[in-house]
Regions:
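Hydrophobic/aromatic residues in alpha-helical transmembrane segments
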Residues: 44, 57, 113-117, 147, ...
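Glycine-rich helix-loop "coupling/hinge" segments at transmembrane-helix boundaries
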Residues: 151-154, 167, 181-182, 223, ...
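Alpha-helical transmembrane segments of multi-pass integral membrane proteins
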Residues: 102-106, 121, 136-137, 165, ...
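Membrane-water interface segments at the C-terminal ends of transmembrane alpha-helices
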Residues: 38-60, 95, 134-157, 167, ...
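Hydrophobic alpha-helical transmembrane segments in multi-pass membrane proteins
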Residues: 98-114, 141-152, 211, 215-232, ...
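Amphipathic cytosolic juxtamembrane alpha-helices at the membrane-cytosol interface
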Residues: 86-101, 105, 125-133, 183-187, ...
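Gly/Trp-centered helix-boundary motif
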Residues: 1-111, 115, 126-127, 245, ...
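Generic hydrophobic transmembrane alpha-helix motif, especially the helices
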Residues: 78, 82, 88, 112-114, ...
């Protein structure tokens, strides 16, 4: 019984430390990063809207009211209607669901690919790393929008196709970030010690490399998510994204805003505004996480440097440590 209690106690302490880390991170985000807090609010709002779109939207999906075509904002239609009489607010809400699904699944696929390429390339190095990086260089040399349009024209439109293409392309491009982090971690003594005692490559990568680059992966995932949402909107605007019957912010800009810009400019304003706010919020949240998780950048208040107040506290703390050392 004593052995079991002694075994359980350290595990509970580890769980408390992990929970305390995330609570402390959230508190520091609220206290030190106002733009990051705004970004977190935008991310939560996007997920909430996407999950509960059926309950939030005033009208069902693709509900048409031909009598009320191109109606201005009113009590019945808060943001007006489009050329078919479809409620614009409902389309925006259902479009948030599409952006959430494509953004989340595409980011997970992207991080799986980028982590696999980056970790193996950075860990093994040598000729393998050189061959992989030359392939990545060649891929990044071509404008990504052209690559996306070419692939989508071959495999056809569809949500699955968009997720697959965006996940693979962004994963290859962002593998450079993971590779750089792996090269930095690989030079540490504990990785070299693991190699010296005979740890296999798979064990070293999973036990010593991956846990120490999780901060980099999380930060990069937030940035990639914003990029994927923006690229999906670009593809849908050009006609290479999701089918027209699926509400998307990009297709709303293309099918409604472009054709009725003079007659009803709000049709382009609202999806463009929603897209801008979501991408901006996700990027601000990612920047705040980068500052909070990177020890070299800690201490800022919405910025990337130490402010005067925190700098004075740091100097005072250093003086106290120096005095204590002399005593």
């Amino acid at each position: 019984m004593t052995t079991n209690a002694e075994t359980v106690a350290p595990n509970q302490q580890v769980e408390k430390k992990r929970l305390g880390f995330w609570i402390d991170l959230f508190r520091r985000l609220i206290r030190e990063k106002p733009l990051g807090t705004f970004g977190l609010f935008v991310v939560i709002l996007l997920f909430f809207t996407g999950i509960f779109a059926n309950f939030i939207a005033p009208f069902p999906l693709n509900a048409v009211h031909l009598v009320d075509r191109l109606s201005p904002p009113s009590a019945k239609y808060l943001l007006g209607t489009d050329q078919l009489g479809t409620d614009v607010l409902s389309q925006l809400i259902y479009g948030a669901r599409i952006s959430m699904i494509i953004g989340v699944i595409g980011t997970l696929l992207s991080k799986l690919i980028s982590t696999t390429i980056g970790v193996t390339s950075g860990f093994f190095g040598g000729k393998f790393d050189m061959i992989v990086q030359r392939f990545v260089d060649a891929f990044m040399a071509v404008p990504q929008l052209i690559v996306l349009m070419t692939i989508m024209s071959i495999i056809g439109n569809g949500m699955f196709q968009v997720i697959l293409v965006l996940g693979i392309t962004t994963g290859i491009s962002s593998s450079r970030v993971i590779r750089s982090a792996v090269i930095t971690i690989k030079s540490n003594m504990y990785v070299q010690a693991a190699d010296a005692i005979g740890c296999g490559s798979i064990r070293t990568m999973t036990r010593h490399i991956l846990p120490n680059i999780m901060a980099t992966i999380i930060i990069d995932a937030t940035i990639i998510m914003g990029a994927i949402i923006l690229q999906e909107a670009s593809l849908s605007f050009l006609g290479y994204g999701v089918p027209p019957d699926i509400p998307s912010w990009g297709s709303m800009l293309s099918l409604q805003g472009e054709k009725y810009m003079q007659q009803a400019p709000a049709l382009a304003l609202w999806p463009g505004f929603a897209l801008s706010i979501v991408v901006y919020g996700i990027n601000m949240f990612g920047d705040a996480l980068r500052d909070l998780l990177d020890p070299r950048l800690r201490g800022g208040v919405g910025r990337y440097t130490l402010n005067n107040k925190n700098l004075k506290k740091l100097k005072k703390s250093l003086r106290n440590h120096q005095l204590a050392a002399k005593i």
